[in-house]
Amino acid sequence: MIGRNHEFETITAAATKVTARGCALVVEGEPGVGKTTLLTASAQWADGNGFTVLNTAGVQSQTTVGYAGVHELVHPILGHVDALPVYQRRALLAAFGLAEEQPPNPLHIGVAMLGLIEEAAAHRPLMLIVDDAQWLDDSSLHVVTFVGRRLASSPVMMLCALRSRLDGKATRLLSLPRLPLGTLDAAESHDLMSRVISGVGGHGLSESAQRRVLAEAAGNPLAIAELTKALITAGDQSMVSAKTPLPTTRRIEQAFREQFDALPPPSRHMLAL
């Protein structure tokens, strides 16, 4: 990773102490700033250092599917459910549609989820990875926040990735400790571009094209990487003038399209004009 040593060291330092004190961290930043990359590197570190790593990611099309996010997260450890007290076991199984019970109280679900995680962590420390938390369903958001506030006595670390400047229920995660992820500085941006150019091959980019990409990307790692690749594919002939729009890729359009779609209708209308 380029420009993320401080954040990575913050995460791994906290993770090495979870046997004494568990914790949760919310990695907060703009689209494309590298939240997923940081979480992936942290998960790989944890996997190599004796942790069981559990993953989930919010999906925009599943925000109305109750408990979908936390079911994906804890599905691999559901074998520990029989060790829970009866009322917790029933609550959890009912929430996941695995028992014919009335939908339980959200508090009971939170307590049961915490109990399941603690039971699994008694055998091996856990690293819980929650990416794109802004797209979790409301019930999963409630559980993740509930559990994140109560990990101090468990050998568990929870990492959540959350987009900055959000409204709505996802902001409840901001009650947890935050780790802001900003843009890259000029040297880091140039280093990333050089690595992308080297990886893509071909004729690279002219100095003027490189300056244009760095200026428009403004330190956003995804923008730097994707604009560089798009320009190499298109060729420098696309750089007719400073007023010529840079070619983009589907990946970068998708990242910022989701941010656009999350805006209220009046704001979307204004930006579309």
Task: Locate predicted features.
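Pre-Walker A (Motif I) flank of P-loop NTPase domains
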Residues: 20-25, 124
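Helix-loop-helix "sensor" segment of P-loop NTPases
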Residues: 16-17, 80, 99-101, 157-159, ...
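N-terminal pre-P-loop "Q-motif" helix
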Residues: 1-14
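A conserved switch/coupling segment of P-loop NTPase cores
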Residues: 44-45, 49, 111-181
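Conserved Walker-type P-loop NTP-binding/catalytic site
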Residues: 67-127, 155, 179, 190-194, ...
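P-loop NTPase Walker A phosphate-binding motif
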Residues: 30-64, 79
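Winged-helix-like regulatory helical subdomains adjacent to P-loop NTPase cores
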Residues: 5, 22, 243-273
